[in-house]
Amino acid sequence: MDKYVQIGLITKPHGLRGEVCVVSYADSPFLMQERIFLQAGKGPCVPYRVRSSRRHSGTELLLLEGIDDRNAAEKLRQHKVLIPHAELPELEDDEVYIEDILGFTVVLDEDGSTLGTLTAFSAPTPEQEVWEITTPDGKEVLFPAAEEFVAEIDVDSETIRITPPPGLLEIYLSGS
């Protein structure tokens, strides 16, 4: 069974002929050139052939086979855009795919204490990734995964060392 990787999210229809707007999480738009899979929530991954793709006002626009009008495109709102993990390009030595580090233990760089586990991620914009970290007592911390706040990702030990912005953890963890 293929393992899929989310590379984007359909946000809304565009125009009348069935195009959809996609917030892309991928560095390369070429990942959405021929075939993609769409998933609603935790439902099945459904394959679609990409008839055309183009960039418009900072977002990717896709025209998918079988999606021929705005009504059909509207039904795809908030669907995840995925590709098989095997189709991802090779990474540099210091790079990782977010899906490969889900489940890693997150520790504070300052004192080495465990904050929790990386359980999910989102990318409100292509330049801004947010990690969801679940603490041992079940609290959810939304963490800006900017380079200046991520000290190290150690794939061998499955740990991520972070340096949170001042006051961030207090917002989520106070009132315990």
Curated annotation (Swiss-Prot):
Keyword Cell cycle recorded: no
Primary localization class, coarse: cytoplasm
An annotated GO BP: ribosomal small subunit biogenesis
TM stretches of this protein: none
Record GO cellular component, one term: ribosome
Family per record: Belongs to the RimM family.
Assembly notes: Binds ribosomal protein uS19.
The protein, known as: Ribosome maturation factor RimM
